[in-house]
UniProtKB/Swiss-Prot annotation:
Single annotated GO MF: toxin activity
Positions carrying Cysteine amide: C64
Family: Belongs to the conotoxin T superfamily.
Any coiled-coil regions, as ranges: none
Tissue specificity statement from the Swiss-Prot or TrEMBL entry: Expressed by the venom duct.
Signal peptide: 1-19
Organism: Conus arenatus
Chain positions listed as propeptide in the UniProt record: 20-45
Name this protein carries in UniProt: Conotoxin ArMLCL-012
Length: 67
């Protein structure tokens, strides 16, 4: 009678659904870092250089803002 509950508890502990604390901490750190990266702002100088190079070298109208 006592064997079945002990077997069930051991099965639950060994199952893949039992989370590893280290893995859980790494996942939460990665999620937090991704959210911080998503919140960064673009540097207007860098965007100006890219659009300027696109307009000067490639002469695409959508880069220069001309219609």
């Amino acid at each position: 009678m006592l064997c079945l509950p002990v077997f069930i508890i051991l099965l639950l502990l060994a199952s893949p659904a039992a989370s590893n604390p280290l893995e859980k901490r790494i996942q939460s750190d990665l999620i937090r870092a991704a959210l911080e990266d998503a919140d960064t702002k673009n540097d207007p100088r860098l965007l100006g250089l890219v659009t300027g190079a696109c307009c000067a070298v490639l002469k695409f109208s959508f880069c220069c803002g001309k219609k």
